[in-house]
């Protein structure tokens, strides 16, 4: 069902001339106060991974040269759903175990499904902005 809804959204968007969507939002979030919690798949990384895969496949179809498909963008890489006190653009606090076992699995699922782009998160990790975090950007995203 989720794949079908993403497929429908892709058909509608592509019919209007769009070829790229800033979706799916695959952040795992566990604080209901966060204003973007409804965009994601909830708090379970396994379910979040299944939904990320389905949405990427729905948006992109089997062949991006098909005019009814659009490129997907897995966001927000990574940890944005763990922002403190549920506040947008806030510091995110989590350890490396949580990063690898809770936060990253939906991004890996999106990547394995062939997602064409990633959007960086707005938070810091170890007081380093996610956009410039060497371990996150180079060692994990580019190599793993």
Spans of model-derived segments:
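Glycoside hydrolase catalytic-domain context in secreted enzymes
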Residues: 1-144
């Amino acid at each position: 069902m989720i794949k079908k809804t993403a497929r429908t959204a892709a058909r509608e968007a592509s019919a209007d001339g769009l070829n790229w969507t800033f979706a799916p939002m695959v952040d795992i979030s566990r604080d209901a106060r966060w204003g973007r919690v409804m965009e994601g798949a909830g708090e379970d990384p396994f379910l979040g991974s299944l939904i990320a895969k389905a949405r990427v496949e729905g948006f992109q179809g089997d062949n991006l040269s098909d005019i009814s498909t659009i490129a997907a963008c897995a966001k927000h890489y990574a940890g944005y759903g763990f922002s403190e006190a549920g506040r947008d653009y806030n510091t995110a606090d989590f350890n490396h175990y949580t990063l690898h076992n809770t936060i990253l699995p939906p991004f890996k699922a999106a990547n394995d499904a062939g997602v064409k782009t990633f959007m960086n998160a707005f938070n810091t990790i170890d007081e380093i902005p996610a956009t410039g975090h060497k371990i996150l950007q180079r060692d994990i995203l580019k190599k793993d």
